[in-house]
């Protein structure tokens, strides 16, 4: 069985140069933990995850202690940092060395890559073009419906 047999086509994606605000909006409405990132020629360049976005907005320990050191201070600092960063571009947050598979790869190979590397959703890229994603849920669906 091939990756193309079970992958999700038309994955949630965003372009380089988009804002952190736009990425956060897309993550929240698409209900996926990561967005595939494309350049202006629609070539796959990497991904940005909800963890990357939250981590960028987390206050530094020094900022929390300077604000008073309480949990409420930390959350207020988190929100302020989020507002400050919202209009910045996602480009520095993009993971550019992401593992990928091709649509013509054997599904078993992709499953091994995902499990060995702890990957929940794997970009499917053919000749530099994003053609889909393969998730652990897609793997489970393959087992259920194709066995």
PLM region spans:
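Tandem CBS (Cystathionine beta-synthase) repeat/Bateman regulatory domains
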Residues: 1-147
